Amino acid sequence: MALASKVATRPAVASRRGAVVVRASGESRRAVLGGLLASAVAAVAPKAALALTPVDLFDDRSVRDRGFDLIYEARDLDLPQNVREGFTQARASLDETKKRVKESEARIDADLDVFIQKSYWTEAREQLRRQVGTLRFDLNTLASTKEKEAKKAALGLRKEFIQAVEDLDFALREKDQASAAKKLEITKAKLDSVLAAVL
């Protein structure tokens, strides 16, 4: 018997299922309404997100020349250690070093006396420590440019200046106004003698 005759003679099987009724549930309605609400919010949201003022763009490529990337240089392991710590850059220009020293001297002369008279002990200590932090390094740099005997004398004067600064710092920590004023004058005199030797 051929395949066509087998298919044609097969008896038809009646479906055992009855009629299927589809009902919409409340959850599917909520999902549809939620989707509509979300699309409406998405359509309105970009208008609300617009800035009231325009965005200003600045070309700050020149700040790299002024030292903006120093923190990244400090982390760059491909650079030598003295470059990463900034020692090479600070010693590169003696004119900049002299300018920093004169600025520190001016701040010590002008600010510390006012802070001591007003009993601003914390400000006086912080200003002193800020200025001496750079002066230690810069005085060494300036002394290293001198001849052997002049360098030795300058480093000796620097050591006396640092001791006077430590005495002044102790007087500031003790909050002794008379002692601090006296030691400030000694510190200024020692700084002037060091600067006369290195500048």
Curated annotation (Swiss-Prot):
One of its GO terms (cellular component) is chloroplast thylakoid membrane. GO terms for molecular function: calcium ion binding. Gene3D superfamilies: Oxygen-evolving enhancer protein 3 (PsbQ), four-helix up-down bundle. Signal peptide: none annotated. It is found in: Plastid, Chloroplast thylakoid membrane. The keyword Thylakoid applies. One of its GO terms (biological process) is photosynthesis. SUPFAM superfamilies: Oxygen-evolving enhancer protein 3. Keywords: Chloroplast, Membrane, Photosynthesis, Photosystem II, Plastid, Thylakoid, Transit peptide. Residues 1-51 form a transit peptide. Belongs to the PsbQ family. This is Oxygen-evolving enhancer protein 3, chloroplastic. It comes from Chlamydomonas reinhardtii.
